[in-house]
Amino acid sequence: ALFSILRGLKKLGNMGQAFVNCKIYKKC
């Protein structure tokens, strides 16, 4: 169960990084 939670957090982290790149660095 813990592994799936960590994997989900990693996926959210990747989405968050893409959002930051889009908003701040204008890389969409």
Swiss-Prot record:
Tissue specificity field: Expressed by the skin glands.
Q: What is its main location?
A: secreted
Disulfide bond sites: C22-C28
Gene Ontology CC terms, in alphabetical order: extracellular region
Subcellular location per the Swiss-Prot or TrEMBL entry: Secreted
**Pfam families referenced in this protein's UniProt entry, alphabetically:** Antimicrobial_2
Q: What is this protein called?
A: Palustrin-1b
Species lineage: Eukaryota, Metazoa, Chordata, Craniata, Vertebrata
